[in-house]
């Protein structure tokens, strides 16, 4: 088995608030909400030992929800030694119950479950001080805390939970049965912020300016006097990563734009124009379309396509180093890997590999560069904020996400030149109509997918047709960890469908994907 490519992962920008994941659907969302309170956070699995937690020097702990019952055999447990660390702790849902149990409280199956919107009655305390006495919250529990631990004040209740929140200000401990991290709990962010800033005493120091400054210094320390090469995909992530590294090492960075033939219409010209104008960076374009298509010939498996694209991508870089940079030593490869990429590729301890990202799990084992991934701890909205802080224009930082493997993973089936041309035309029409309708700010991204191995019968011009379907996948999201389908007006969908079926040969059907994430991922492959 090939060894993993060398990666130097710098120290986190600050001592983190650790979100302990008990199997929650929303663990990443909790981490993001902590960051929205301008406090740095990371997620760790519940299997982390006390020694591992202590080594991270956390500023506070947040215990996530989870699907288990705390009293069932094999359920994730909370080591009571956590409370001997002297750090503030906040429990949410299952984490709230695990906290109560570990501290001597009582958790039971009361026979009264609460799922969805529930009214919370505030009884006092500091956690909900200044907020409405009765407020809507989002619940998801079958068990409940029936008695708080000694020394804790019960500060809220609900119809199904006599102890819906408790706190111990002296020990800087608190918890809630509901989910403050979801948008269905209107005052949830205020409660979480109150714990972080008032209970835990943490400053609001996780800002775009501070993030950019720290990351620039980290890159400078990692690369030293070396030279780096950065791959531009045309997307936000690689552009911000390149701008950060250029700020750190100046003209010792060379940016390479690999045209792998899997780009959308007009994308190559846009990258060459916008990025160079914004940064003045050294940019080399490599035309590798034929090489990529040859490597992808006959491949239909999504994981196989991603790994081939990742491998060919690196080979194109190595060729650029030889042909363009000559004898100048280039040791570092900059990539725009984000926190969700790392999580979905199994890069976080205790996480399952959902799919290989071309810039994480799709890299070859014999990689000849050391990776520099300055954005690997950031969510997308944080990347955009850092990009603005670095002076990148809105044309770059506000772009909708586009995967590095490009249209190669938006063709279900074999990637061919003909299918790419078909998909480009359909994608261009969809983007034109969504922009004309003023929907760009509403939609996180809209993958347009060609079902290359599927045909359906149609009628066009009184003739029977047997063409491919096109799938529209407009989604709304905040960080790509979860997503919902965007309610695009019917008249806009009608225009897109009419134009695609009239203007794109071989397409006779347009369908709309209305699946949320989870269970479906944003991209089809």
Swiss-Prot record:
Catalyzes the synthesis of GMP from XMP. NCBIfam families: guaA_Cterm, guaA_Nterm, PRK00074.1. The lineage of its organism: Bacteria, Bacillati, Actinomycetota, Actinomycetes, Mycobacteriales. Residues 16-205 form the Glutamine amidotransferase type-1 domain. Its EC number is 6.3.5.2. PANTHER family: GMP SYNTHASE [GLUTAMINE-HYDROLYZING] (PTHR11922:SF2), GMP SYNTHASE-RELATED (PTHR11922). Residues 206-399 form the GMPS ATP-PPase domain. ATP binds at residues 233-239. Homodimer. Pathway: Purine metabolism; GMP biosynthesis; GMP from XMP (L-Gln route): step 1/1. This is GMP synthase [glutamine-hydrolyzing]. It comes from Mycolicibacterium paratuberculosis (strain ATCC BAA-968 / K-10) (Mycobacterium paratuberculosis). The active site is at residues 93, 179, 181.
């Amino acid at each position: 088995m090939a060894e993993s490519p060398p990666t130097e992962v710098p120290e986190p920008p600050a001592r983190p608030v650790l979100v302990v994941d008990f199997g929650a659907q929303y663990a990443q969302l909790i981490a993001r909400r902590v960051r929205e309170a301008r406090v740095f956070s990371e997620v760790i699995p519940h299997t982390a030992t006390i020694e591992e937690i202590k080594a991270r020097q956390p500023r506070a702990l947040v215990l996530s929800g989870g699907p288990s019952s705390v009293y069932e055999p094999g359920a994730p447990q909370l080591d009571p030694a956590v409370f001997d660390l002297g750090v503030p702790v906040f429990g949410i849902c299952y984490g709230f119950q695990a906290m109560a149990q570990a501290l001597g409280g009582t958790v039971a199956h009361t026979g009264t479950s609460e799922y969805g919107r529930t009214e919370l009655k505030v009884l006092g305390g500091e956690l909900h001080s200044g907020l409405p006495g009765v407020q809507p919250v989002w619940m998801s529990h079958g068990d409940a805390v029936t008695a708080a631990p000694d020394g804790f004040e019960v500060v809220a209740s609900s119809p199904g939970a006599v102890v819906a929140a408790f706190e111990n200000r002296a020990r800087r401990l608190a918890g809630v049965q509901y989910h403050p991290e979801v948008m269905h709990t209107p005052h949830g962010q205020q409660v979480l912020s109150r714990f972080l800033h008032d209970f835990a005493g943490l400053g609001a120091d996780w800002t775009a300016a501070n993030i950019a400054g720290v990351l620039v210094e980290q890159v400078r320390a990692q690369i030293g006097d070396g030279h780096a090469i950065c791959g531009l995909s045309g997307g936000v992530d690689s552009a911000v990563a390149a701008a950060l590294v250029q700020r750190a090492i100046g003209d010792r960075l060379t940016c390479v734009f690999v045209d792998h033939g899997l780009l959308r219409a007009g994308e190559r010209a846009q990258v060459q124009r916008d990025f160079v104008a914004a940064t003045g960076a050294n940019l080399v374009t490599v035309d590798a379309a034929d090489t990529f298509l040859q490597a992808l010939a006959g491949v239909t498996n999504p994981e196989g396509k991603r790994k081939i694209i990742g491998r060919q991508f690196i080979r194109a870089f190595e060729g650029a180093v030889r042909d363009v940079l000559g004898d100048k030593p280039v040791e570092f490869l900059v990539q725009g890997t984000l926190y969700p990429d790392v999580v979905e590729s199994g890069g976080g301890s205790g996480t399952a590999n959902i799919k290989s990202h071309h810039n994480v799990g799709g890299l070859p084992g014999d990689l000849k560069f050391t990776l520099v991934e300055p954005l690997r701890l950031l969510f997308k909205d944080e990347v955009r904020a850092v990009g603005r802080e670095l002076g990148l224009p809105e044309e770059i930082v506000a772009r909708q996400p586009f995967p590095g493997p490009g249209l190669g993973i938006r063709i279900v089936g074999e990637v061919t030149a003909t299918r790419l041309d078909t998909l480009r035309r359909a994608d261009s029409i969809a983007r034109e109509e969504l922009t004309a309708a003023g929907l760009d700010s509403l939609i996180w991204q809209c993958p347009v997918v060609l079902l290359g191995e599927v045909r359906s019968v149609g009628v066009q011009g009184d003739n029977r047709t047997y063409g491919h379907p096109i799938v529209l996948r407009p989604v709304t999201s905040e960080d790509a960890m979860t997503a919902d389908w965007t309610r695009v007006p019917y008249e806009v969908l009608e225009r897109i469908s009419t134009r695609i079926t009239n203007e794109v040969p071989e397409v006779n059907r347009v369908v709309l994907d209305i699946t949320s994430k989870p269970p479906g991922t944003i991209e089809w492959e």
